[in-house]
């Protein structure tokens, strides 16, 4: 895992990732992003290197941010950068901001502190040090203290970088801290060139409150506390010009003049502006209430319209359902009438048992009987006694059932008991099937429990 001087093996991440805690954490996160199911991070790093090499072979040019590009110093050493390197890397003071001073010991960034950096540092400083002041005033004090510390290090009493406000910041990252503090400032660079003196304002890094001297200069602090939250360009210039002035009388005179010109600090103008602001706020609140009432009325109308549409749809569905019920009832009545018409006989007042005679008469008309068939039917009628004839008569299913079910009579079973003879069974089968059966019939005995 050590760095090879001859560059025989290329590493995806340089040696700073193996020296500092934050670097190790960043390397592990990068490897886990490349292969989330990895069990061996060394093998995953080799896979990452091979993947990048394959991209180079295919013609792509992957850009790898080195730690020197990010933090401003070489990654092959754990020593913090010297003051000359920082001054060489930092831009000129007239362009953006002065270079920051580096302490003797390097501060390591823990893994959990990395999430604090995207938040604006000037806002955090304003909340931690002076909550009553506006943000632009705190930012001006921060930049003034940084410029004083960089320009006057020979005095010995210069204020250093506020490390207690940024506990996890690298030495080389303080340049980015200064650039981040420059964002909310709207004043030109010329207003920041003067050095603030300790007579008007003092910034103590131990307690981090803003101390103001007693006397007439106290009105200067009150004016800063009473300043409106929304800072205009004129208000920012007023605060920036008033800071470097020495002496309480000059600050008070400047305050009275600027109050007459701008009308944004102290005095009766503040009351007038407050009244106007209150009226504007009341008018805005009234407009908002009117909008809310209009929105509620529109919503009520929409709900009423939707309710009416639902009621009409429900009534229409009920009418359609009633129509369908009537149609079904009518169809059912028609079917019942047709069924009754099918089951009733078509004869003119003949009894129910006349179907057999009518069928026999029709067959007699279509085909004349022979002499042998007449004699056979007469003999069968003589053989039967009157008692048996009456007993076997109602048993004929042809007489009891209508013409619709006459086709199913060949599947009808003939029940035989002890009193029935073979001739009776044969005659009953002949009546049902209307065929001349042979006199040989195979009979099976009934079960003992069904016998009478």
Curated annotation (Swiss-Prot):
Pfam families in alphabetical order: CCDC71L
Region (Disordered) location: 81-106, 209-256, 322-404
Keywords: Coiled coil, Phosphoprotein
Entry keyword annotation includes Transferase: no
Chain segments annotated as coiled-coil in the UniProt record: 279-344
Top-level taxon: Eukaryota
Signal peptide: none
Biased composition (Low complexity): 87-106, 332-344
Phosphoserine sites (modified residues): 129
Biased composition (Basic and acidic residues): 377-386
Name by which UniProt lists this protein: Coiled-coil domain-containing protein 71
Organism of origin: Bos taurus (Bovine)
């Amino acid at each position: 895992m050590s760095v090879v001087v001859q560059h025989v093996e290329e590493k995806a991440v340089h040696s700073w990732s193996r020296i500092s805690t934050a670097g190790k954490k960043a390397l592990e996160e990068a490897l886990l992003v490349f292969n989330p199911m990895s069990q061996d991070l060394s093998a995953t790093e080799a896979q990452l290197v091979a993947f990048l090499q394959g991209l180079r072979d295919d013609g792509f040019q992957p850009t790898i941010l080195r730690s020197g590009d990010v933090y401003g110093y070489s990654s092959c050493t754990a020593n913090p950068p010297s003051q000359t390197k920082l001054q060489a890397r930092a831009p000129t003071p007239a362009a953006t901001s002065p270079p920051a001073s580096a302490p003797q010991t390097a501060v390591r960034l823990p893994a959990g502190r990395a999430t604090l950096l995207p938040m604006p540092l000037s806002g955090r400083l304003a909340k931690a040090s002076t909550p009553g002041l506006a943000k632009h005033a705190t930012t001006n004090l921060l930049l003034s203290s940084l410029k004083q510390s960089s320009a006057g290090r020979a005095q010995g009493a210069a204020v250093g970088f506020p490390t207690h406000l940024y506990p996890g910041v690298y030495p080389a990252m303080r340049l980015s801290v200064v650039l981040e503090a420059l964002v909310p400032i709207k004043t030109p660079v010329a207003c920041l060139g003067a050095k603030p003196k300790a007579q008007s304002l003092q910034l103590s890094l131990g307690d981090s409150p803003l101390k103001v001297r007693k006397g007439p200069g106290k009105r200067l602090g009150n004016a800063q506390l009473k300043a409106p939250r929304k800072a205009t360009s004129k208000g920012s210039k007023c605060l920036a010009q008033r800071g470097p002035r020495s002496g309480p009388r000059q600050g008070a005179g400047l305050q009275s003049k600027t109050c007459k010109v701008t009308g944004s600090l102290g005095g009766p103008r503040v009351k007038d502006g407050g009244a106007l602001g209150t009226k504007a706020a009341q008018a805005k609140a009234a407009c908002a209430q009117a909008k809310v009432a209009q929105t509620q009325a529109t919503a009520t109308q929409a709900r009423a319209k939707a309710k009416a549409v639902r009621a009409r749809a429900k009534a229409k569905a009920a009418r359609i359902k009633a129509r369908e019920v009537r149609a079904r009832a009518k169809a059912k009545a028609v079917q019942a009438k047709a069924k009754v018409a099918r089951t009733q006989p078509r004869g003119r007042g003949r009894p129910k048992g006349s179907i057999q005679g009518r069928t026999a008469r029709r067959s007699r008309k279509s085909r004349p009987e022979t002499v042998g068939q007449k004699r056979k039917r007469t003999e069968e009628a003589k053989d039967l006694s009157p008692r048996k004839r009456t007993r076997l008569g109602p048993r004929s299913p042809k007489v009891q059932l209508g013409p619709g079910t006459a086709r199913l009579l060949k599947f009808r079973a003939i029940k035989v008991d002890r009193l029935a003879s073979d001739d009776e069974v044969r005659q009953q089968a002949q009546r049902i099937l209307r065929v001349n059966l042979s006199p040989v019939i195979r009979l099976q005995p009934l079960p003992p429990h069904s016998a009478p």
